[in-house]
Amino acid sequence: MQFLIPVVILCVSLVDSQKVLYNNEIGFNNGFYYAFWKDSGSATFTLESGGRYAGNWTTSTNNWVGGKGWNPGNSWRTVNYSGYYGINEYANSYLSLYGWTTNPLIEYYVVESYGSYSPLNCPGGTDEGSFTSGGATYQVRKCRRTNAPSIIGTQSFDQYFSVRTPKKGFGQVSGSVNFADHVQYWASKGLPLGTHAHQIFATEGYQSSGFADITVS
Protein backbone atom coordinates (compact mmCIF):
# COMPACT_ATOMS: atom_id res chain seq x y z
CA MET A 1 0.00 0.00 0.00
CA GLN A 2 2.91 2.38 0.53
CA PHE A 3 3.53 2.43 -3.24
CA LEU A 4 0.00 3.43 -4.29
CA ILE A 5 0.42 7.18 -3.71
CA PRO A 6 3.55 7.70 -5.88
CA VAL A 7 2.07 5.54 -8.64
CA VAL A 8 -1.14 7.61 -8.69
CA ILE A 9 0.81 10.86 -8.77
CA LEU A 10 2.87 9.63 -11.73
CA CYS A 11 -0.27 8.67 -13.65
CA VAL A 12 -1.86 12.07 -13.09
CA SER A 13 1.32 13.79 -14.27
CA LEU A 14 1.42 11.78 -17.50
CA VAL A 15 -2.23 12.41 -18.30
CA ASP A 16 -1.95 16.11 -17.54
CA SER A 17 1.05 16.59 -19.86
CA GLN A 18 -1.00 15.69 -22.96
CA LYS A 19 -4.48 16.77 -23.94
CA VAL A 20 -6.31 15.78 -27.12
CA LEU A 21 -8.84 18.28 -28.49
CA TYR A 22 -11.74 17.11 -30.64
CA ASN A 23 -13.63 20.40 -30.77
CA ASN A 24 -12.72 24.04 -31.38
CA GLU A 25 -10.82 25.52 -28.46
CA ILE A 26 -8.42 28.32 -27.51
CA GLY A 27 -6.42 28.81 -24.33
CA PHE A 28 -3.01 28.62 -22.73
CA ASN A 29 -0.89 25.49 -22.24
CA ASN A 30 2.59 25.18 -20.76
CA GLY A 31 3.32 28.86 -21.26
CA PHE A 32 2.02 29.06 -24.84
CA TYR A 33 -1.25 30.22 -26.32
CA TYR A 34 -2.98 27.64 -28.50
CA ALA A 35 -5.82 27.72 -30.99
CA PHE A 36 -7.65 24.87 -32.70
CA TRP A 37 -10.46 25.41 -35.19
CA LYS A 38 -12.24 23.19 -37.71
CA ASP A 39 -15.44 23.54 -39.65
CA SER A 40 -16.31 19.83 -39.80
CA GLY A 41 -15.01 16.28 -39.55
CA SER A 42 -12.63 14.34 -37.36
CA ALA A 43 -9.47 16.48 -37.19
CA THR A 44 -7.81 16.34 -33.76
CA PHE A 45 -5.25 18.58 -32.07
CA THR A 46 -2.97 17.36 -29.28
CA LEU A 47 -1.36 19.67 -26.73
CA GLU A 48 2.08 18.34 -25.83
CA SER A 49 4.70 19.68 -23.39
CA GLY A 50 6.14 23.16 -23.86
CA GLY A 51 5.63 24.55 -27.36
CA ARG A 52 4.93 21.17 -28.93
CA TYR A 53 1.65 20.19 -30.57
CA ALA A 54 0.35 17.54 -32.98
CA GLY A 55 -2.41 17.66 -35.56
CA ASN A 56 -4.06 14.74 -37.31
CA TRP A 57 -6.66 15.13 -40.05
CA THR A 58 -8.43 13.30 -42.86
CA THR A 59 -10.60 14.33 -45.79
CA SER A 60 -13.64 14.16 -43.49
CA THR A 61 -12.60 17.65 -42.35
CA ASN A 62 -13.17 20.40 -44.90
CA ASN A 63 -10.86 22.99 -43.29
CA TRP A 64 -8.91 23.13 -40.03
CA VAL A 65 -6.07 25.10 -38.44
CA GLY A 66 -4.20 24.72 -35.17
CA GLY A 67 -0.97 25.76 -33.53
CA LYS A 68 0.84 27.18 -30.53
CA GLY A 69 2.28 30.64 -30.03
CA TRP A 70 1.38 33.86 -28.26
CA ASN A 71 -1.56 36.12 -27.51
CA PRO A 72 -1.10 38.93 -28.16
CA GLY A 73 1.48 38.56 -30.89
CA ASN A 74 3.97 41.25 -31.86
CA SER A 75 5.82 42.60 -34.88
CA TRP A 76 9.39 41.79 -33.86
CA ARG A 77 9.37 38.17 -32.65
CA THR A 78 11.71 35.57 -34.15
CA VAL A 79 9.90 32.22 -34.14
CA ASN A 80 11.79 28.91 -34.24
CA TYR A 81 10.14 25.66 -35.26
CA SER A 82 11.05 22.02 -35.74
CA GLY A 83 9.33 18.69 -36.11
CA TYR A 84 7.50 16.57 -38.65
CA TYR A 85 5.17 17.83 -41.39
CA GLY A 86 3.51 14.70 -42.70
CA ILE A 87 1.75 15.50 -45.95
CA ASN A 88 2.44 14.79 -49.60
CA GLU A 89 2.55 17.02 -52.66
CA TYR A 90 -1.12 16.38 -53.40
CA ALA A 91 -2.38 17.55 -49.99
CA ASN A 92 -3.73 21.08 -49.66
CA SER A 93 -2.03 22.31 -46.49
CA TYR A 94 0.11 25.13 -45.07
CA LEU A 95 2.82 25.22 -42.40
CA SER A 96 3.13 28.85 -41.39
CA LEU A 97 3.43 31.62 -38.86
CA TYR A 98 -0.18 32.72 -38.70
CA GLY A 99 -2.00 35.55 -36.98
CA TRP A 100 -4.50 38.37 -36.93
CA THR A 101 -4.56 42.07 -36.21
CA THR A 102 -7.46 44.46 -35.71
CA ASN A 103 -7.80 48.07 -36.85
CA PRO A 104 -7.15 47.16 -39.61
CA LEU A 105 -8.50 43.63 -39.57
CA ILE A 106 -5.75 41.57 -41.24
CA GLU A 107 -5.14 37.83 -41.49
CA TYR A 108 -1.47 37.11 -42.20
CA TYR A 109 0.65 34.10 -43.08
CA VAL A 110 4.39 33.52 -43.38
CA VAL A 111 4.22 30.21 -45.25
CA GLU A 112 7.27 28.00 -44.73
CA SER A 113 5.88 24.98 -46.56
CA TYR A 114 2.74 23.93 -48.38
CA GLY A 115 1.33 21.08 -50.43
CA SER A 116 -0.62 21.21 -53.67
CA TYR A 117 -1.81 24.80 -53.52
CA SER A 118 0.29 27.94 -53.15
CA PRO A 119 -1.45 31.01 -51.73
CA LEU A 120 0.40 32.98 -54.39
CA ASN A 121 -2.42 31.73 -56.63
CA CYS A 122 -5.26 33.23 -54.61
CA PRO A 123 -7.87 34.63 -57.04
CA GLY A 124 -8.20 38.38 -57.33
CA GLY A 125 -5.02 39.04 -55.36
CA THR A 126 -2.12 41.37 -56.14
CA ASP A 127 1.55 40.44 -56.30
CA GLU A 128 3.63 42.63 -54.02
CA GLY A 129 7.16 41.61 -55.04
CA SER A 130 9.73 39.64 -53.07
CA PHE A 131 12.45 40.09 -50.46
CA THR A 132 15.09 38.04 -48.65
CA SER A 133 15.01 37.01 -45.00
CA GLY A 134 17.04 34.35 -43.23
CA GLY A 135 18.74 33.29 -46.45
CA ALA A 136 15.45 32.56 -48.23
CA THR A 137 13.36 34.49 -50.73
CA TYR A 138 9.76 35.26 -49.83
CA GLN A 139 7.20 36.19 -52.47
CA VAL A 140 4.38 38.40 -51.20
CA ARG A 141 0.75 38.50 -52.24
CA LYS A 142 -2.24 40.41 -50.89
CA CYS A 143 -5.64 38.75 -51.15
CA ARG A 144 -9.15 39.85 -50.22
CA ARG A 145 -11.80 37.88 -48.33
CA THR A 146 -15.41 39.05 -48.55
CA ASN A 147 -18.01 38.09 -45.94
CA ALA A 148 -15.70 35.44 -44.51
CA PRO A 149 -15.11 34.09 -40.99
CA SER A 150 -12.74 36.19 -38.87
CA ILE A 151 -11.78 36.63 -35.22
CA ILE A 152 -14.59 39.20 -34.89
CA GLY A 153 -17.26 37.31 -36.81
CA THR A 154 -18.13 37.42 -40.49
CA GLN A 155 -16.24 40.31 -42.10
CA SER A 156 -14.43 41.46 -45.23
CA PHE A 157 -10.68 41.82 -44.79
CA ASP A 158 -7.26 41.62 -46.44
CA GLN A 159 -4.86 38.69 -46.18
CA TYR A 160 -1.08 39.07 -46.45
CA PHE A 161 1.00 36.08 -47.57
CA SER A 162 4.78 35.78 -47.50
CA VAL A 163 5.61 32.46 -49.18
CA ARG A 164 9.07 30.93 -48.78
CA THR A 165 10.91 30.01 -51.99
CA PRO A 166 11.95 27.27 -52.04
CA LYS A 167 9.46 25.85 -49.56
CA LYS A 168 10.73 23.63 -46.76
CA GLY A 169 9.11 20.50 -48.15
CA PHE A 170 7.69 17.58 -46.17
CA GLY A 171 8.84 15.19 -43.45
CA GLN A 172 11.37 16.52 -40.96
CA VAL A 173 11.39 20.33 -41.00
CA SER A 174 13.06 23.08 -39.01
CA GLY A 175 13.74 26.77 -39.35
CA SER A 176 13.03 30.23 -38.04
CA VAL A 177 10.93 33.21 -39.07
CA ASN A 178 12.19 36.72 -38.38
CA PHE A 179 8.77 38.33 -38.39
CA ALA A 180 10.14 41.89 -38.23
CA ASP A 181 11.53 41.46 -41.76
CA HIS A 182 8.06 40.63 -43.06
CA VAL A 183 6.35 43.45 -41.21
CA GLN A 184 8.87 45.99 -42.54
CA TYR A 185 8.55 44.75 -46.12
CA TRP A 186 4.75 44.68 -45.98
CA ALA A 187 4.74 48.25 -44.64
CA SER A 188 7.00 49.37 -47.50
CA LYS A 189 4.32 48.10 -49.89
CA GLY A 190 1.50 49.89 -48.11
CA LEU A 191 0.35 46.77 -46.25
CA PRO A 192 0.05 47.84 -42.61
CA LEU A 193 -0.75 45.71 -39.60
CA GLY A 194 -2.95 46.82 -36.70
CA THR A 195 -3.20 45.79 -33.07
CA HIS A 196 -2.01 42.23 -32.64
CA ALA A 197 -4.35 39.44 -31.62
CA HIS A 198 -3.03 35.87 -31.51
CA GLN A 199 0.11 34.75 -33.35
CA ILE A 200 0.77 31.02 -33.70
CA PHE A 201 2.99 28.72 -35.69
CA ALA A 202 0.24 26.70 -37.30
CA THR A 203 -0.61 23.74 -39.45
CA GLU A 204 -3.63 24.09 -41.70
CA GLY A 205 -5.39 21.55 -43.91
CA TYR A 206 -8.10 21.95 -46.53
CA GLN A 207 -9.89 18.94 -48.03
CA SER A 208 -6.80 16.82 -47.44
CA SER A 209 -5.22 14.41 -44.96
CA GLY A 210 -2.00 14.44 -42.99
CA PHE A 211 -0.17 14.55 -39.69
CA ALA A 212 2.05 17.18 -38.08
CA ASP A 213 4.14 17.14 -34.89
CA ILE A 214 5.67 20.60 -34.40
CA THR A 215 7.59 22.32 -31.59
CA VAL A 216 7.54 26.12 -31.43
CA SER A 217 9.85 28.45 -29.51
From Swiss-Prot:
Reactions catalysed according to its record = Endohydrolysis of (1->4)-beta-D-xylosidic linkages in xylans
Where does the record place it? Secreted
Tissue specificity, please? Expressed in larval carcasses and gut, and adult gut.
Q: Which PROSITE patterns match?
A: GH11_1 (PS00776), GH11_2 (PS00777), GH11_3 (PS51761)
| Classification via Gene3D superfamilies | 2.60.120.180
Kindly give the InterPro entries that the UniProt entry links to this protein.
ConA-like_dom_sf, GH11/12, GH11_AS_1, GH11_AS_2, GH11_dom, Glyco_hydro_11
The active site lies at 107, 204
Q: Which SUPFAM superfamilies match?
A: Concanavalin A-like lectins/glucanases
Domain (GH11): give its ranges. 20-217
From its record, what is one biological process in GO terms? Answer: xylan catabolic process
Please name the top-level EC class of this enzyme: hydrolase
What is any Pfam family matched here?
A: Glyco_hydro_11
User: Glycosylation annotated at which residues?
Assistant: 56, 80
Q: What is its EC number?
A: 3.2.1.8
Cite the entry's keywords alphabetically: Carbohydrate metabolism, Digestion, Glycoprotein, Glycosidase, Hydrolase, Polysaccharide degradation, Secreted, Signal, Xylan degradation
Query: What terms describe the molecular function in GO for this protein?
Result: endo-1,4-beta-xylanase activity
UniProt pathway: Glycan degradation; xylan degradation
So which domain of life are we looking at?
Eukaryota
Q: Tell me which positions the record assigns to the signal sequence.
A: 1-17
Cellular component GO terms, alphabetical = extracellular region
The family assignment reads:
Belongs to the glycosyl hydrolase 11 (cellulase G) family.
Write the protein's name: Endo-1,4-beta-xylanase
